[in-house]
A protein has these predicted regions:
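Acidic, metal/ion-coordinating pockets
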Residues: 1-259
């Protein structure tokens, strides 16, 4: 099974990049399942029903989220109604939506788990991602999942690597999101889990994490707190492909994507 995971899609330009690139990429790489992190897919940050529907129409099987998932209030009922758009599972219990889904692909099923880190993201009041992962992996196994995939939306590289090694051999693929910078460490961990610390982003290349460069420069240089605005220009799509052997449920190859 070939799994394509696409990094944080930024605004309408990022969505448009997915629309233009994904069909050809799926065909050329013989992709079976597509997971897209869409927590920044709306132009004003966050995700909306419109941007989620757009990504599903482009070919996403599952959309994952993160710390910006609830930036737009209208997404709350959408998260409750659509089981294939996720928000981090370890957010407080009263949070709308879910952080786990089971995708039925016919001859196999894929469980997708979405978690958020706790380092530098304390305001989210998220529970321990290690313990949450334990619970959700047990649920996936009880549900008969053939493959388990984790999107860990986290700030700290150390937290991502630690959870990746903790889950090695228990999940088929583990990828990080959130930083918008693709890491060059895609690998297969010792017990067979495909891993990358961060997928990167799908957004404007000449930007600061998808935001207009002058806004970020002015904030860092002089403390100007102007509103973040999406950058304009040519976009790149970042992601990673995991080829997973269904019998041992382990990754046999990883390939970074930068288009």
């Amino acid at each position: 099974m070939r799994l394509l995971c696409i990094g944080d899609v930024c605004g309408s330009l990022g969505c448009e990049k997915v629309r233009r690139v994904l069909p050809t990429l799926k065909r050329q790489e013989k992709i079976d399942v597509v997971i897209i992190n869409g927590e920044n897919s709306a132009d004003n940050n966050g995700v909306t029903p419109f941007s989620a529907d757009y990504l599903f129409a482009c070919g996403a099987d599952v959309i994952t989220g993160g710390n910006h998932s609830f930036r737009n209030e209208e997404i709350r009922s959408y998260l409750d109604d659509n089981q294939f758009i996720l928000r981090p599972s370890n957010l407080p219990e009263e949070t709308n939506g879910r952080g786990y889904c089971l995708l039925d692909m016919g001859r196999y099923s894929v469980a997708v788990i979405n978690l958020v880190g706790t380092i530098y993201l304390e305001r989210l009041k998220a529970s321990n991602p290690f313990l949450a992962a334990d619970e959700l992996i047990e649920k996936a196994e009880n549900d008969g999942a053939d493959i388990i995939v984790v999107d860990f939306h986290a700030e700290a590289t150390s937290e991502k690597r630690a959870l990746g090694f903790y889950l090695d051999g228990r999940v088929s693929a583990f990828f990080g999101t959130h930083t918008h910078i693709q890491t060059a460490d895609n690998k297969i961990l010792p017990k067979g889990t495909g891993y990358i610390t961060d997928l990167g982003m799908t957004g404007v290349e000449n930007s600061v994490l998808g935001v207009k460069t002058e806004i970020i420069i002015n904030r860092l240089k002089s403390g100007d707190m102007s509103k973040f605005l999406q950058a304009e220009g040519e976009c790149t799509l970042n992601g990673c492909i995991f080829e997973i052997d269904l019998a041992p449920r382990k990754t046999v190859e990883t390939k970074r994507i930068l288009i």
